[in-house]
Each structure stands twice: as structure tokens, then as C-alpha cells.
A protein has these predicted regions:
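N-terminal, positively charged, Ser/Thr/Ala/Gly-biased leader segments
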Residues: 2-38, 175-203
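A generic structural signal for short, non-catalytic loop/turn and secondary-structure boundary residues
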Residues: 13-16, 44, 140, 156-158
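Pocket-edge structural micro-motifs
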Residues: 24, 83, 158
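Short, acidic Gly/Pro/Ser/Thr-rich loop/turn segments
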Residues: 28-30, 41, 154, 170
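Feature captures the catalytic cores and cofactor-binding loops of soluble hydro-lyases/lyases
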Residues: 34, 41-142, 149
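Acidic, glycine-rich flexible loop/linker segments
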Residues: 124-202
């Protein structure tokens, strides 16, 4: 069934340079990221309009003007900078789908919920953990922030900030490998190993 699979279905992660969107909240859970009433949708696309729905809209579905995503100056931002323990709560992957579909490709926070962190890499989103003081500084960054994944560095107008990521997770994003592609790569390596490790027959 997968004989013709190309091995790449996510977009390869390239350098990103945009202004940041500051979300000054801690313990943002997955139900706040995308409310449960929208989980019946099964396609990954289309969730962007439901991102932070209860914060973006009032009971009449009018935009709340005091919410950061409704500020026009952040409309083209691809970088969300937020508080600790982002993505906590239930393990719904829809939360990452909503962030990615809205346009966020990088999330910067002091810490993430473990399952949310893993789900980011499955969907082409880069989660970056930095010290809280640095995160607070980036929330108030007036210029553009550049994300250079290959060299693992963030660049502001005045400084370069290194960040950590595992070599495997880095490869997943740089090559745009989804879970199926990762599995096929592993199968190829296992087959190659078995081919060169056959036990000789015993006479």
C-alpha cells in the first residue's frame, strides 16, 4: 500500500523571520487552544479559525478587540511566544493542528506539556524551550525574530540566542518527515541491517 510513498508529506522547515505574537498566559491547556466542540472534525486543515476560539470571540462570534490575535499587526506572525507549561491538559493533537493551520510554525515557552511537545514535531511545528527571563524579553521584541533551526539559534536585532533540540527531532523538521515517512526510514534501516547480519546456515 505504501510502495509509492515519497517519504515526505510535511513541508521541510526553513528559516523563519517574522515579528513575534506575545501570549502572556501560563498553563494554557489544549481546550483553550482549541475547544472540545470542534474536535469532531477529522481533517488537519481548517482548524486555524478555531484557535483560541473562546478568547478571540464573544458569545455573538464577534472579535474581542483586546485579544492579541485580533490585533492586525500580528496577522503575519509565525512565532508565538508564551508562558510555561504550554499545551497542558488532554493529549489532543488538534491543538497543534490549530496552531499550525493558523500559521504558527514556532512556539517559544519556558516549558511545554510532554505530549504536546511531541505532537509539534509530528506536524511541522518547532517548540523551543528557553529560560523564562529570555522568553519575557522576546515577548517585548519590537523587531523581527529569525529562527535558524539548522544552526539552532534565534536572532534578534541585537543578539543571537542558542536553543536545544535533539538531533532526531531536528532532522524530522528539516526534512519534513511525518510519522509514516519516519517508519519507512526505520524499516529501510532494519532491512539493511538484516541483509548484512544473516546468520550463516549450520551444516
Amino acid at each position: 500500500m505504501l510502495d509509492n510513498w515519497t517519504g515526505i508529506s510535511m513541508e521541510a522547515f526553513k528559516k523563519i523571520k517574522t515579528i513575534v505574537t506575545p501570549l502572556d498566559q501560563i498553563n494554557v491547556d489544549t481546550d483553550q487552544i482549541v475547544p472540545k466542540q470542534f474536535l469532531k472534525l477529522i481533517q488537519k486543515s481548517g482548524f486555524g479559525k478555531y484557535l483560541f476560539y473562546d478568547w478571540r470571540y464573544d458569545e455573538n462570534e464577534n472579535q474581542k478587540q483586546d485579544f492579541v490575535l485580533n490585533d492586525k499587526k500580528y496577522q503575519n506572525s509565525k512565532i508565538l511566544v508564551t508562558g510555561e507549561n504550554f499545551g497542558c491538559g488532554s493529549s489532543r493533537e488538534h491543538a497543534v493542528w490549530a496552531l499550525q493551520d493558523y500559521g504558527f510554525l514556532v512556539i517559544i515557552a519556558p516549558s511545554f506539556a510532554d505530549i504536546f511537545y511531541s505532537n509539534c514535531f509530528k506536524n511541522g511545528v518547532l517548540p523551543i524551550e528557553l529560560e523564562e527571563r529570555m522568553v519575557e524579553k522576546l515577548k517585548h521584541e519590537s523587531g523581527e525574530l529569525e529562527i535558524d533551526l539548522e544552526n539552532q539559534v534565534l536572532k534578534t536585532k541585537t543578539e543571537e540566542i542558542p536553543f536545544e533540540i535533539s538531533p532526531y527531532q531536528k532532522m524530522i523538521l528539516l526534512e519534513g518527515l511525518d510519522e509514516i515517512a519516519q517508519t519507512l526510514q526505520l524499516e529501510d534501516k532494519i532491512s539493511e541491517f538484516e541483509k548484512h547480519s544473516k546468520i550463516p546456515s549450520v551444516l
